[in-house]
């Protein structure tokens, strides 16, 4: 039986309707936290052609809320655009209205796109930075003051091994993830005297619909000479355990960082890559 170590806590999870966000939301609920999830939904229309992302339908958001409630926790689901301050504030208000507070903030929402620096679209650059980095700032700005006032809080930011390693033709994504590490450390130092921690998790490749969107594009670039599973297996071959990361593994790490007993872990970047060091 899972210990309800987060009972009485309330969480906000961006990107919570799918992938890592969903896995983290369910892990928090398993440990007793009420969870508000926000995602940019497919009702806004298709994602930009050059971006690798997954826009969930409203049904996915509702389904995750039902999964949270099935674990004995409260749930709220919202359409969320982290590029807009008013959308972030509405999501925060919905969580406060439902649970009375936000103790835990998990920032997951993000997009990816590949373009070389030479000729890189400025609008694409700005959109990736605005989503992946500025979005984390906006949610943190909304949640941090009350955490400090109450003397307890946990913020977990999903970064990426791309922040440290870099990736060819992926400057905006890598820059945004590096920026997340800097933001994480600054927030950690601001919150530390008040019982608030802020840490980052940097996964390698995670088995999500967003990854598979990238794989489809990579396969097309090489002429679709192999299947998605064959391509993912080729990625996994470079990992020490010969498999990529599952979303639930990220959920477990995030839930651990939110425990009372994790208060000494602050301003850290935890790599989850099965030991791959590149």
Protein language model features and the residues they cover:
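Active-site helix of classical SDR
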Residues: 140, 176, 184
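Short, small/polar-rich loop/turn modules that mediate ligand/substrate recognition or access, typified
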Residues: 192, 197, 265-267
